[in-house]
Amino acid sequence: MPVSYSRWDRRDAADRNAMGAAALDLCRAMRAMDGVDDSRFYWTGTDSLVLLTHADGGVLAAPPSPQAAAANFALGDLARQTSAETWLDPSQGMEMYSRANG
């Protein structure tokens, strides 16, 4: 099952409480999408957090729901996304490699 990882750093003028609330709203919007098993955020320091979302196959590659997109922009107003990755489990990685090499 793929995992989406993103790291967010608070903008200088942003309120930490508002940033946490925006991250929670994004997680809730993600969990409401079909195929998403879990979405949570974790503080990694006083000014940064990480979001982890576990979802089925193509859900993470598809456009987000309108609610998830709005929540993503709301978080973006308060924090800068400094990195984002999608992690594949070993079987998915091997499947992708096999398709690429026919």
Locations of regions flagged by a protein language model:
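Short, surface-exposed ligand-recognition loops at beta-strand->loop->(often short) alpha-helix junctions
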Residues: D9-A21
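Amphipathic alpha-helical interaction segments
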Residues: R16, G35, V50-L51, Q81, ...
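An amphipathic, aromatic/His-enriched active-site/gating alpha helix that lines ligand/cofactor pockets
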Residues: R28-D37, H54-D89
